[in-house]
Regions:
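Conserved SAM-binding loop
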Residues: 221
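Class I S-adenosyl-L-methionine
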Residues: 1-203, 211-217, 262, 267, ...
Length: 504
């Protein structure tokens, strides 16, 4: 259903039949995008004639087409089918970004206007009733200290537009998160002082950190961020102009802020630790890497050994590696190491992380050593990622912080995502998972339950979980099914019957 709604999946397949060189596809797309910006013509009118007709819903966001092409390139480089490649939806990226933004300081807050309506104009009965209500007078919101926030701007800890700095991506892909930040930054500076915008734009691009292992991705990301900035009138094609920095300066800032490297195995190339990491790393097991290569088996074995042997200050870099290691779990642990203390990680991952046994060490790390504050549960992910059957979770974690409870948001649907406020509709149910209750449910595995959206069903589910938590588990010695001091074992959802064959 998601693929039909998307309506564009066939365009990429037709493009592959027309031109099967992915690098050339990306190069032509980016150069045509630049021509479109220079000539103020639609990008579809400038594409080569032998390219398939561009669907209408791809005309408005050229960056999303680049994300698709890079996702297909990434899949093919590992020998996987490009049909299973799913770039991050811009709508989800916008919601995630929104949840971590600070107050906009570009335009000063307007004082709350007091009503000039006189109480004496009300009839006596109404006036007496209003006086009994004892309504408070409207006051200015003082939750945010503007002076402290402006000082943070001067120290390059944030932008006037509300973006925490430095802001990083440990698996940049096409730079989607930073491209959406550019859009948000430009919107915040709309109708603002041009010189203020220019100064804040320099501040932003002097404090971006994007890393990716693929040289084609790095090159494409630099071009994409340049074109996005030109599109949103933050950068000029030539020399510096009012409100816009020059292209030459922007390219120098991008060379310093977008680099090629391996975030998992290498060192973080920037000296300043990021304040915020926004990322959607590869959802790929090590055993699925290098499938299209002759010596893929040996390469996988060597990669696994290298990752297990990596150390920092004598301690393993990845302390939670278990079973069939999935790369997104390593990116979570590595991103938390890179962040400054108190920095925030927002990462998109499969929702199996919340419950699978092999992720138990990682969940324990997040609870015991960091502040795991949020989990957005998106169960109907096929409406966001066309063709995907797996659920998605967006984690919110404070590096080396503490969290009194995990705020579990969901189930979330596509229509719940927002570009303002906290990124989610107020209709989305929120459940605070307190540590004591969490422990009694999961017996220290820190598994997160899947809760229904309906209020009555949710209440019933919580009561059932509380009741089940008091009963012995199948693997407990005191369970009634334990015979001859041998507990029932569960494998992949089925009871192991070998120990009880005589009694069946």
């Amino acid at each position: 259903m998601g693929t039909l709604q998307n309506g564009v999946s066939g365009w990429y397949a037709r493009l592959d039949r027309c031109l099967d060189n992915r690098e050339q596809q990306i190069d032509i797309w980016l150069s045509t995008w630049e021509k479109s910006l220079r000539s103020f013509q639609p990008i579809a009118a400038l594409l080569p004639e032998d390219w398939p007709t561009l669907p209408a819903n791809l005309l408005t966001d050229p960056g999303h087409v680049l994300d698709h092409l890079l996702a297909r390139h990434d899949a093919e480089s590992d020998g996987r089918s490009p049909r299973g490649a799913h770039p991050t939806p811009p709508r989800l990226a916008d919601a995630v970004i929104c949840s971590e933004m600070k107050d906009n300081l570009v335009n000063p807050k307007k004082p709350v206007q007091q009503s000039n309506f006189l109480m004496s104009n009300l009839p006596p009965g109404f006036r007496q009733h209003v006086e009994q209500l004892n309504l408070p007078k409207a006051t200015q919101d003082n939750d945010v200290d503007d002076n402290a926030e402006r000082e943070a701007v001067e120290q390059n800890k944030r932008t006037l537009s509300g973006i925490p700095l430095p802001v990083a991506d440990t698996a940049a892909g096409g730079g989607l998160f930073h491209a959406r930040l550019i859009r948000r930054h430009a919107d915040a500076h709309q109708d603002a002082d041009p010189e203020l915008q220019k100064e804040d734009t320099r501040r932003l691009f002097s404090n971006i950190q994007l890393l990716d292992v693929d040289p084609l991705v790095v090159k494409s990301t630099k071009t994409r961020l340049l074109l996005e900035s030109i599109r949103h009138e933050l950068v000029s094609f030539g020399p510096e102009t009012p409100g816009k920095i020059s292209r030459e300066e922007m390219e120098a800032l991008l060379d310093a802020g977008v680099m090629q490297g391996d975030a998992l195995q290498g060192e973080w190339p920037w000296t300043a630790a990021p304040e915020l990491v926004l990322t959607n790393p590869p959802w790929l097991r090590i055993k699925d890497r290098f499938r299209g290569m002759e010596d893929g088996s040996q390469l996988r074995k060597e990669l696994g050994e290298r990752l297990r042997n990596l150390t920092d200050n004598g301690a393993p870099r990845f302390s939670t590696m278990r079973g069939n290691v999935n790369l997104y779990r390593l990116f979570i642990e590595r991103s938390l190491q890179i962040l400054k203390d108190g920095g925030r990680l927002r990462i998109i991952a499969p929702d199996s992380l919340l419950r699978e046994q092999s992720s138990h060490p990682l969940r324990e790390l997040l609870v015991k050593h960091h502040g795991w504050t949020h989990a957005w549960a998106i169960e109907e992910a096929n409406l966001l990622f066309p063709g995907m059957t797996q659920g998605v979770v967006v984690l919110g974690i404070t590096a080396n912080g503490e969290a009194p409870a995990l705020n579990l948001h969901g189930p979330i649907t596509r229509s719940d995502l927002r570009k303002e406020g906290e990124g989610l509709s107020s209709r989305v149910p929120v459940f605070q998972l307190i540590e004591d209750r969490w422990t009694s449910w999961s017996r220290d595995t820190w598994a997160v339950p899947r809760l229904p959206r309906d209020r009555m069903e949710r209440s019933h589910t919580l009561k059932v979980l509380d009741r089940l938590a008091e009963l012995p588990r199948l693997s407990d010695e005191e369970h009634p099914l334990t015979t001859n001091q041998r507990q029932v074992r569960v494998r992949v959802g089925e009871i192991d019957q070998t120990a009880h064959a005589k009694n069946i």
